[in-house]
Amino acid sequence: MKTMTTAEIRRAFLNYFSENGHKIVHSASLVPGNDPTLLFTNAGMVPFKELFIGTETRDYRRATSAQRCVRAGGKHNDLENVGYTARHHTFFEMLGNFSFGDYFKAEAIPFAWRFLTEVLQLPAEKLLVTVYHEDDEAYRIWQEKIGLPADRIIRIGDKAGKAKYESDNFWAMGDTGPCGPCTEIFYDHGAEIFGGRPGSADEDGDRFIEIWNIVFMQFERDAEGTMKPLPKPSIDTGMGLERIAAVMQGVHSNYDIDLFIHLIDAAAKAVGCKNEGQASLKVIADHIRATVFLMVDGVLPSNEGRGYVLRRIMRRAIRHGYKLGQQGLFFHKLVAALVAEMGEAYPEIIAEQARITETIRKEELRFAQTLTAGMQILEQDLATLKGTIISGETVFKLYDTYGFPVDLTNDIARERGLTLDEAGYEALMQAQRERAKASGTFRADKTYTVSGKTAFLAYQQEQTESTIEAIFVQEQAADTLDCGDEAVLVLNQSPFYGESGGQIGDSGVIYHQNGAFLVSDTQKQGDVLLHFGRLQRGVLSVGDTVCAEIDRARRAAIRRHHSATHLLHQALRMTLGTHVQQKGSLVDADKLRFDFSHDAALTAAEIGAVEQLINEQILRNQPVNISEMPYDQACAQGAMALFGEKYGDIVRVVKMGADDFSVELCGGTHVKQTGDLGLVKIIAQSAVAAGIRRVECVAGLAALRYCQQQETQLQRIAAVLKSDLEHSVEKIERLQQDTKTLEKTVQQLKRTVALGGTQETAESVVDIHGWKTMAVRRDDLDNAILRDTADQLRDKYQLDVVVIGSSDGEMARLVVSVAKSAAALKAGAIVQTLAAFIDGKGGGRPDFAQAGGKNIQGLDAALAALPQALPQK
């Protein structure tokens, strides 16, 4: 056995299968394309799912890949185990070879065996395998073709007490669909390592480690559980790169392989930790991989969906840095170390290094602020805590509202001899999960069972004769459609464009003399177009010859807006820099929305420059050239491949503008000349997430309407100001200055009134338990004036404590100011007692505190209750 680095193993695997007729497919995005059932790509077969289920075809039947995967959040969630076991990761690479009806068991098993024993040179005697207990074919191949002795081929049955086929050696894509037995290859680390053979009571030990799983997709399971043989059985295999690297490098933990040794060393230096065996360093090293690769695929930290999972991963890593004593910013510094380790295999992280580093740094700053805010809330709740249990409501509020980690709340509680109401917290979390589930987040879309494919004519025609191949009413196949029915139609050929690449689907009509179906939307399902709509009149049936006609005016508007995204993308790159990359888009008939990587809002000058570049290309009225060529050739010519899109070997290249101003891979519909756009105008911009901006634009007649609306508004403003447009800005500026002067005068008058100076104020000084106090009410004052007034009254009358109550008609407020000489008094404790009268809560420093509540009627009672809040002097 020879020693190999992680990079060498990855390269050797892909080259081996390429030499054996497999197409090398670059890792797909961690954000699954067109699969709302998955949060993240979590297995090597995910990018090929549509090939396995037969809804898509490609120009190859064998493939191999090193697929980037994430398991954190959702059904497959390894997050809490990461750092504390030898083989759990949030991010990992899955090496795989796949056959889509090409070869099967007799070829797949020898492929794996030869790679392990000949390429990697693993000792054959160190390998043993498992097979499904009914899979005699796989057993015979291992025994007769490979030559494994019977004692190293283990049959694994169904799990005790479970249904048939519920086994570690039987794989299924879901409750229905493709499935089949699998064979797993294990490596024996030796008798000195604890652990039993697969299938034994001690199988969870570390002696026998699974390194490769080969799935034989040979059945189709229907809703009744019946297994039918697939006409073209397929192969899906997976070998964790980190696991096989551990074997090849003679270590028992994935965290001891070359890649992780370097990342852990970088993490140790970043946090100032000398003990590199710390579990927290493993967490940080693992999480920087997940963080960087999720970001390079367009995921950004947020409070929902994938962004929420990313934020949780990042904050968990940062929290572990804090546990090691690092209170400063450190996590973003590890991006460079990861790029050094994996940039050669994944050059996209090199291109995105600066943006990702800055995004992580900003999230670290945000988390530091979160911790500060969370600690204040926690301290306020602890000040009124009765007993030793922090309520589930408090823990949930800290976590859900402020992003305050539950483990941090638990640490603080433990330091103070307190515990958490974990049951209450879990109940609130479960309720939140149910709400999320009900909202349909990441719900599974319906798959319609259709044979064949739709001939796609959207590039050539806007109307065509077609045949109805299938009808679905309420998701069930039907032969006939009656007037008023909402349905989905499938045609043998169609001029309709199915939603993809950010461009919405076409609408229009499908009709013959006896019926008309209004199409409201068109979607793609693999190679089939689904036409959604309603039968407006008559009857339509499967087999009918119909005319399919798109809404031409709507298509033209969509076409203009889609074409405008190309010019916009390039204009943004020329104005802001080449770091700008498209991160998403939505194109419809009314406007376009374009998301891109950039850290700051566009200035007025930058917006003007972008619009200038776009409209210059429009005025040149150059032809839009569209051609097809191999993917590699297109990229070599500088064509930009866009985020989230999947490309085949042959791609569509769209060149737009003079001197090839924009060159992109795109499957959408486009204008014939740049002049067809008429005018493009940016109408809005916003922040989508950290490091991602969004601009909205209009083109053509929509741009004209926008300009006319803006002009109308300006004319109305000028009329209200009783000015002309030329001098309106000057008049507004004068009005603003006058308003500021008046506001300042009002604030000064309020302060004068609040301080009083009358006999009533002096008479409000009262001795309570030996303390010189004042409790007065001053309504309709803002917080700043209340604070200043309390401090000034305290100093003016040399008081130990001042309490001021105030109401603005909606809320009651209390402020407490304590003199430094009255060290025995705590403003926070005083305000907590008084806040109960206004149904509120409060807190603050020993010398100043404030509270707010909704019970205005209780304000006078709160002031009168000051004696209850003061101890004897």
Curated annotation (Swiss-Prot):
<dbReference type="InterPro" id="IPR018162">
    <property type="entry name" value="Ala-tRNA-ligase_IIc_anticod-bd"/>
</dbReference>
<dbReference type="GO" id="GO:0005829">
    <property type="term" value="C:cytosol"/>
</dbReference>
<dbReference type="GO" id="GO:0008270">
    <property type="term" value="F:zinc ion binding"/>
</dbReference>
<dbReference type="InterPro" id="IPR003156">
    <property type="entry name" value="DHHA1_dom"/>
</dbReference>
<keyword id="KW-0030">Aminoacyl-tRNA synthetase</keyword>
<dbReference type="InterPro" id="IPR002318">
    <property type="entry name" value="Ala-tRNA-lgiase_IIc"/>
</dbReference>
<dbReference type="GO" id="GO:0004813">
    <property type="term" value="F:alanine-tRNA ligase activity"/>
</dbReference>
<keyword id="KW-0436">Ligase</keyword>
<dbReference type="GO" id="GO:0045892">
    <property type="term" value="P:negative regulation of DNA-templated transcription"/>
</dbReference>
<dbReference type="InterPro" id="IPR018165">
    <property type="entry name" value="Ala-tRNA-synth_IIc_core"/>
</dbReference>
<dbReference type="Pfam" id="PF07973">
    <property type="entry name" value="tRNA_SAD"/>
</dbReference>
<dbReference type="GO" id="GO:0000049">
    <property type="term" value="F:tRNA binding"/>
</dbReference>
<dbReference type="InterPro" id="IPR045864">
    <property type="entry name" value="aa-tRNA-synth_II/BPL/LPL"/>
</dbReference>
<dbReference type="InterPro" id="IPR009000">
    <property type="entry name" value="Transl_B-barrel_sf"/>
</dbReference>
<feature type="binding site">
    <location>
        <position position="670"/>
    </location>
    <ligand>
        <name>Zn(2+)</name>
    </ligand>
</feature>
<keyword id="KW-0862">Zinc</keyword>
<dbReference type="GO" id="GO:0002161">
    <property type="term" value="F:aminoacyl-tRNA deacylase activity"/>
</dbReference>
<keyword id="KW-0067">ATP-binding</keyword>
<keyword id="KW-0479">Metal-binding</keyword>
<dbReference type="GO" id="GO:0006419">
    <property type="term" value="P:alanyl-tRNA aminoacylation"/>
</dbReference>
<keyword id="KW-0547">Nucleotide-binding</keyword>
<comment type="similarity">
    <text>Belongs to the class-II aminoacyl-tRNA synthetase family.</text>
</comment>
<dbReference type="InterPro" id="IPR018163">
    <property type="entry name" value="Thr/Ala-tRNA-synth_IIc_edit"/>
</dbReference>
<dbReference type="InterPro" id="IPR018164">
    <property type="entry name" value="Ala-tRNA-synth_IIc_N"/>
</dbReference>
<dbReference type="InterPro" id="IPR012947">
    <property type="entry name" value="tRNA_SAD"/>
</dbReference>
<keyword id="KW-0963">Cytoplasm</keyword>
<comment type="function">
    <text>Catalyzes the attachment of alanine to tRNA(Ala) in a two-step reaction: alanine is first activated by ATP to form Ala-AMP and then transferred to the acceptor end of tRNA(Ala). Also edits incorrectly charged Ser-tRNA(Ala) and Gly-tRNA(Ala) via its editing domain.</text>
</comment>
<keyword id="KW-0694">RNA-binding</keyword>
<dbReference type="Pfam" id="PF01411">
    <property type="entry name" value="tRNA-synt_2c"/>
</dbReference>
<dbReference type="Pfam" id="PF02272">
    <property type="entry name" value="DHHA1"/>
</dbReference>
<feature type="binding site">
    <location>
        <position position="566"/>
    </location>
    <ligand>
        <name>Zn(2+)</name>
    </ligand>
</feature>
<feature type="binding site">
    <location>
        <position position="666"/>
    </location>
    <ligand>
        <name>Zn(2+)</name>
    </ligand>
</feature>
<dbReference type="InterPro" id="IPR023033">
    <property type="entry name" value="Ala_tRNA_ligase_euk/bac"/>
</dbReference>
<keyword id="KW-0820">tRNA-binding</keyword>
<protein>
    <recommendedName>
        <fullName>Alanine--tRNA ligase</fullName>
        <ecNumber>6.1.1.7</ecNumber>
    </recommendedName>
</protein>
<keyword id="KW-0648">Protein biosynthesis</keyword>
<dbReference type="InterPro" id="IPR050058">
    <property type="entry name" value="Ala-tRNA_ligase"/>
</dbReference>
<dbReference type="GO" id="GO:0005524">
    <property type="term" value="F:ATP binding"/>
</dbReference>
<feature type="binding site">
    <location>
        <position position="562"/>
    </location>
    <ligand>
        <name>Zn(2+)</name>
    </ligand>
</feature>
